[in-house]
Amino acid sequence: MYRNCRKAFTFSLRHYSTAPTEKPSLKLVAELRKRTEVSITKAREALSASNNDVSAALEWLQKDLITSGAKKAAKLGGRPTPEGLISVSVLSRGGESHVAGVRAAMIELNCETDFVGRNELFGRLAADIAHTAAYISDRTGSATAFNRAFPLDVLKDAPLLSQLNPTAPPTGTVGSSIRDMISKVGENVSLRRALAVVENSPSPNGDIALRIGSYVHDYKIGSLALLALKSRGISSSLNSDAFRERLEFLERALARQILGFETTSVNSSEDQTSLYNQPFMMFSREMDSPLVGEVLRNWSEKEGLLKENSDGGVAVLDFAKWKVGETFDE
């Protein structure tokens, strides 16, 4: 009786068995990884589930990323994120008649470890978020103030725009892209803060131009500085490539100065940490450098922006400096 049952069971297995799915080739795995940067295991799983069809495997990976990303985000959401990086995007430095004023943004994207913080995918996401923030921002507030309180919920709901390929159609929102990153790196990832500087360009025929200076060091600290140039015919000066080159050097030096010193304000006679009261070492690189305020006045005179007893020239209106993980006022 037992022998007959075993024969029947064996026959049944043979009758209903099917050929195993063909093992994904190394070529297909490599192609899928190149297009998606997933792990070898995940690429094989996607191809096996899609009958070795690359297009179907891409769709499978996208669905899997959404599902696994949401699960991991929920699981890792409470873990601290002390590491990360600062990213700056400047879409328009301003001061030229063919661009629409100043448009820039700075963001802080956090993760759990420095290893992930230096990951190329993580850095690319941060750059894209900063680019998106600069692109979608509207001007609010006074002409001399940064838009410091950029609403993170608005930014997370916005389509993520590529910094490297701005014309590429978005494949998801900022929020969904952060969840995807959590799934890829296996760590909690959080967007901590963002600011945008958006200032309309004054009249091309006027005597005032706005500019933005920026600097990021080691992706851990970054700064933005809003400048005003006041002089008759400033638009003509800005049309000169040589003048713009010298101006950009000054702007970069100011942004570096703000990072390199304990800068708490722009210009205050009672505050020794104010920018204008500091030796401008990032410009001349000498220990006995003249003060920032003096350098700006001398530079303006040399460039013909400042006449005697004139209130023109170049001036710093506002600035922001960030460091990864620092405490800040909400």
Swiss-Prot record:
One of its GO terms (molecular function) is translation elongation factor activity. Residues 1-16 form a transit peptide. InterPro entries: EF-Ts_dimer_sf, Transl_elong_EFTs/EF1B, Transl_elong_EFTs/EF1B_dimer, UBA-like_sf. It comes from the Eukaryota. GO terms for biological process: mitochondrial translational elongation. Gene3D superfamilies: DNA helicase RuvA subunit, C-terminal domain, Elongation factor Ts, dimerisation domain. Keywords: Elongation factor, Mitochondrion, Protein biosynthesis, Transit peptide. It is found in: Mitochondrion. One of its GO terms (cellular component) is mitochondrion. Associates with the EF-Tu.GDP complex and induces the exchange of GDP to GTP. It remains bound to the aminoacyl-tRNA.EF-Tu.GTP complex up to the GTP hydrolysis stage on the ribosome. Belongs to the EF-Ts family. This is Elongation factor Ts, mitochondrial. It comes from Laccaria bicolor (strain S238N-H82 / ATCC MYA-4686) (Bicoloured deceiver).
